[in-house]
């Protein structure tokens, strides 16, 4: 049994972490922090936790920081910039850190400072941090002290592109043209739990809109995934268009590419099936079937469909996930399982909720 702490337990990802870790047979949640709710039981704020967790929120003071250093793993479900203030002291004490914000996702300090408008507090630790996408970085995660949990959109994008880039790296010719278009839609929970006019019921219901078209913070993370994580041997230009749709949770990304003559000769359905044959959380749909967001709701599953149109020389990959689970808290637990040598599906092997 390992001791876990959750810093920032009142946001949607924090709530999901409590839900998932409370059911994990090898984890004890020994500390839960919130400045705004210190002294309050978690199940008083979130009735869904009644009978599951009666832990009391603590403030993040000096005494709490000392307690964090006695844990085996600390999850940061906090705004960007919080984890990097504490990570160095925690790792020096032998504590493993999983950050669900962006502090340890981007390896480039210049990119981090540009997109998040703040200086990095521990650039040396950033150099050793591991990007927490188990389907690609499993071996590195197993030996990591600090894991940067991926963003929700990049999870769909990078896993949707992985079989293509890997197949292309084995060839002497490009299989897809340079331009990649990612048209992504997220439920409103992806924007967080804070009060916002855009998330007001009257504003978000019966409404559908694009946002951050000029540039979203997840774009450099996707570009890093293609160029470095997947180590593409060819250059690609990614156009990323995020949208907010009137549903609570769920994400669907459509990835559009043009095939070269060599790419049109490939059987991309087979490529995807072979690439993910051993991945228990990734389901490649049979040819002609397309996933919907409800099929992965409240689960750590990610479903992929592949559509190849050789007449138009086009390849479309459709990816769905629950943005709060595989796109956030579930993936964090999956990373924890890898870091501590547990079965990767432990605490995560449950069916999606239907309807």
UniProtKB/Swiss-Prot annotation:
It catalyses: N-acetyl-L-glutamate 5-semialdehyde + phosphate + NADP(+) = N-acetyl-L-glutamyl 5-phosphate + NADPH + H(+). It is an enzyme of class 1 (oxidoreductase). Its EC number is 1.2.1.38. GO terms for molecular function: N-acetyl-gamma-glutamyl-phosphate reductase activity; NAD binding; NADP+ binding. SMART domains: Semialdhyde_dh. It holds the Pfam family Semialdhyde_dh. The keyword Nucleotidyltransferase does not apply. It is found in: Cytoplasm. Keywords: Amino-acid biosynthesis, Arginine biosynthesis, Cytoplasm, NADP, Oxidoreductase. GO terms for cellular component: cytoplasm. The active site is at residue 152. SUPFAM superfamilies: Glyceraldehyde-3-phosphate dehydrogenase-like, C-terminal domain, NAD(P)-binding Rossmann-fold domains. Pathway: Amino-acid biosynthesis; L-arginine biosynthesis; N(2)-acetyl-L-ornithine from L-glutamate: step 3/4. GO terms for biological process: L-arginine biosynthetic process. Disulfide bonds: none annotated. Belongs to the NAGSA dehydrogenase family. Type 1 subfamily. Catalyzes the NADPH-dependent reduction of N-acetyl-5-glutamyl phosphate to yield N-acetyl-L-glutamate 5-semialdehyde. PANTHER family: N-ACETYL-GAMMA-GLUTAMYL-PHOSPHATE REDUCTASE, CHLOROPLASTIC-RELATED, N-ACETYL-GAMMA-GLUTAMYL-PHOSPHATE REDUCTASE, CHLOROPLASTIC-RELATED-RELATED. This is N-acetyl-gamma-glutamyl-phosphate reductase. It comes from Psychrobacter arcticus (strain DSM 17307 / VKM B-2377 / 273-4).
